[in-house]
Amino acid sequence: GLALGLKPTKTIYDLAVSGGTLDADKIDGFLSQHPSGARALMAPLRPDQAAAIGTPFLREVFEILRSRFDFVLVDTPPAFTAEVIAAVDVSTHLCVVGMLDALSLKDTKIGLETLEQMGYDPNAITFVLNRADSDVGIAASDVEQLLGRAPDLTVGSDRAIPRALTSGQPIVVAEPRSKAAGSYTSL
């Protein structure tokens, strides 16, 4: 929510502890509205709240959202927790983001290999290389050799990104003519 400038009044934790029957109308009451028209089910405010949300509940929420919206985006942490696996299991497409530093590339390689072992279709994964023009000792052209897969999209470093994050707007809204916005629009 922070990157979208949304202040959570209700979160998925509040939905989980609200009791009663879970359906699309109930979920609607817990969605935050972005000025662009996008709606967001906000993350829990504290780690203890996140721990109280079970994966069966998440799976049910994801299925209801998928039946209701054309696109459901789930921003996950970079680890294969039970919650992340629940999101992956109901996904039709994944976007894996990595950067040019050695640790990120190692984690990206492990993540892509894990998804393959889980039986996820590699053609349904978009690999985005973020800050692809950074001079960190690894060239973007080396990534395919290191990971066994070329990035589907490269996004260069752009000062417009932190400005957009600070303003709470997506880069394509805050600075639509920026290089980064052009890259993300092609996604």
What are the roles of these predicted feature ranges?
Residues 8, 20-23, 54, 157, ...:
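Residue-level signature of the cytosolic catalytic core of signaling kinases
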Residues 41, 75, 155, 184-187:
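Residue-level signature of catalytic and energy-coupling elements of molecular machines
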